């Protein structure tokens, strides 16, 4: 086992502090509308240019083990804020640096770090409560677009596309970001339920040019097991044929005699039919078939529920206004399911989302929820080069997360103003002793830091800007994009309250942990051994006279 190096007290905190500063200083140049870019070398491919705080933080590894520990702790602030709120990573990093920097001085001067931590926690709790009072719910599409624009570094095209996507699929709809083939950034909305399974045979297509199968007012049969023989299906097929309506069969698989018979009937024109594999696998497949059945007002043919294929009638089938199937996807538009049944199913999925601990399961449940309630929107991001594409895609994803957060918890004045505006509640805190008071004062100074940095990045004197904003009321603040002092909510400079709250809580949490650190342990770097002298080459004798 390699030997360890141990640092105590001031020396440990000094090294950690140096690491915190190195990471935070690299990240904070990106803050605000006039924030600068950071260029990151990649071991392969072109360098990445970004203004995304968490992307910068993730790239930083320091040579000194102790400094690196400090940097990694602050990196966690950025990552955690990004995971929960999706934005606000730079703000969180700046707050963590400011809290730790102020706290280290006080601990070095003999203050009790545990009491300081208690003061910090009390201050953060009060500020979070006051942020809730300051927040206003998002009223319309315009405000959602403004949040998206601010988060995408003042790119109004991105803000407007996200607002349009949200208005079309609802706040619980799925919005995904993909790379476009061209230069334009566009929005594509898939209405109804779509899943990634296509027709089992190309003979089912109704439009040979487009190679798609479009059916109007079809019956929809959901079957949990594989269908290989025809005899089980004959009763229901005869009933559907009599009514002269199309039929969509969704099953684990359809093969052999069953598939051949369906294809022959389709080609002869006896029955307009299409067979599709059910989406998903295992338990998820069962759940998705049940979703389709609820959406279309049908029953899942399942032995678990005591329903057999040979016993079903047309009454057990679902229906929809239209079903479109291509080689890879199926879209069910306007299913005929009862509103109450769909609501009950949605409630059940929401409960599962709350309970699950797996990120993957949560994502899949949210997709199912979106397919039931709204639909799916895809933002195709266009750019001229691969480097620009990566940078733009990052900004779109940030903006998308910020708008979701705004819809969830409301909006507050942007540009670092909200934290300055709620600082007055810190006067009402009753600390137990002087050390707790010091903790409250650390937060009082730290929450001004994001505004100071935004002003500094825009070429203004931070202290003067902070003083002027502190004198104002409500939404009055500094618009760094124009250099004006104005009502920020009125001109659309707004932040999601959730992003501001999460950034503050995460920053205070990690900075407090660092402050109460008394000892740091890291592996000793191994001394570099000198390269041995190369040995003489044998057999070189008798070669004199060579020049």
From Swiss-Prot:
It is found in: Cytoplasm. It holds the Pfam family Cpn60_TCP1. This is Chaperonin GroEL. ATP binds at residues 30-33, 51, 87-91, 415, 479-481, 495. It catalyses: ATP + H2O + a folded polypeptide = ADP + phosphate + an unfolded polypeptide. InterPro entries: Chaperonin_Cpn60_CS, Cpn60/GroEL, Cpn60/GroEL/TCP-1, GroEL-like_apical_dom_sf, GROEL-like_equatorial_sf, TCP-1-like_intermed_sf. Keywords: ATP-binding, Chaperone, Cytoplasm, Isomerase, Nucleotide-binding. SUPFAM superfamilies: GroEL apical domain-like (SSF52029), GroEL equatorial domain-like (SSF48592), GroEL-intermediate domain like (SSF54849). GO terms for molecular function: ATP binding; ATP-dependent protein folding chaperone; isomerase activity; unfolded protein binding. The keyword Cytoplasm applies. It comes from the Bacteria. One of its GO terms (biological process) is protein refolding. CDD domains: GroEL (cd03344). Together with its co-chaperonin GroES, plays an essential role in assisting protein folding. The GroEL-GroES system forms a nano-cage that allows encapsulation of the non-native substrate proteins and provides a physical environment optimized to promote and accelerate protein folding. Belongs to the chaperonin (HSP60) family. Coiled coil: none annotated.
């Amino acid at each position: 086992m390699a030997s360890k190096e141990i640092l105590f007290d001031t020396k440990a905190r000094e090294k950690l502090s140096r690491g915190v500063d190195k990471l935070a200083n690299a990240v904070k140049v990106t803050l605000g509308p006039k924030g600068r870019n950071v260029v990151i070398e990649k071991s392969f491919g072109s360098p990445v240019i970004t203004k995304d705080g968490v992307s910068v933080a993730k790239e930083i590894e320091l040579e000194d083990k102790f400094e690196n520990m400090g940097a990694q702790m602050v990196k966690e602030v950025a990552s955690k804020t990004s995971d929960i709120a999706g934005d606000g990573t730079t703000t969180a990093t700046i707050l963590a640096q400011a809290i730790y920097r102020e706290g280290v001085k006080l601990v070095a001067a003999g203050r009790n770090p545990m009491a300081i931590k208690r003061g910090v926690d009390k201050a953060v709790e009060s500020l979070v409560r006051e942020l809730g009072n300051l927040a206003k719910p998002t009223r319309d599409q315009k405000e959602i677009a403004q949040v998206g624009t601010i988060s995408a570094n003042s790119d109004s095209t991105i803000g407007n596309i996200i607002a349009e996507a949200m208005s079309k699929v609802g706040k619980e709809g799925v919005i995904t970001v993909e790379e476009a083939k061209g230069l334009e950034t566009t929005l594509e909305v898939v209405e109804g339920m779509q899943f990634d399974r296509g027709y089992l045979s190309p003979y089912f297509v109704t439009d040979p040019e487009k190679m798609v199968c479009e059916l109007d007012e079809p019956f929809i049969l959901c079957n949990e097991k594989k269908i290989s023989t025809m005899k089980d299906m004959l009763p229901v097929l005869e009933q559907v044929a009599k009514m002269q309506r199309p039929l969509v069969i969704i099953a684990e698989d359809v093969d052999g005699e069953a598939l051949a018979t369906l294809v022959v009937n389709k080609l002869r024109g006896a029955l307009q039919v299409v067979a599709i594999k059910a989406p998903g696998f295992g338990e998820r497949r069962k759940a998705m078939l049940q979703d389709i059945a609820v959406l279309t007002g049908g029953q899942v043919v399942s032995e678990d529920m005591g329903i057999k294929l040979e016993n079903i009638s047309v009454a057990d089938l679902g229906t929809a206004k239209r079903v479109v199937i291509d080689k890879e996807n199926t879209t069910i538009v306007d299913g005929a399911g009862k509103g109450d049944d769909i609501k009950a199913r949605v409630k059940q999925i929401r409960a599962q989302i709350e309970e699950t601990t797996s990120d993957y399961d949560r994502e899949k449940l949210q997709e199912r929820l979106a397919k039931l309630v709204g639909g799916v929107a895809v933002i195709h991001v266009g750019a001229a080069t691969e480097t620009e594409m990566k940078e733009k895609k990052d900004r779109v994803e940030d903006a998308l997360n910020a708008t979701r957060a705004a819809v969830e918890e409301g909006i507050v004045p942007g540009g670092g103003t909200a934290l300055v505006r709620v600082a007055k509640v810190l006067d009402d805190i009753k600390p137990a002793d002087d050390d707790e008071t010091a903790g409250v004062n650390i937060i009082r100074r730290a929450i001004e830091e994001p505004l100071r940095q935004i002003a500094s990045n825009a070429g203004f004197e931070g202290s003067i800007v902070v003083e002027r904003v502190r004198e104002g009321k409500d939404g009055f603040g500094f618009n760094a994009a124009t250099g004006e002092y104005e009502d920020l909510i009125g001109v659309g400079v707004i932040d999601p309250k959730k992003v501001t709250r999460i950034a503050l809580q995460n920053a205070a949490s990690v900075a407090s942990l660092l402050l109460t650190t008394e000892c740091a342990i890291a592996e000793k770097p191994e001394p570099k051994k000198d390269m041995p002298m190369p040995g003489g080459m044998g057999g070189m004798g008798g070669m004199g006279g060579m020049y």
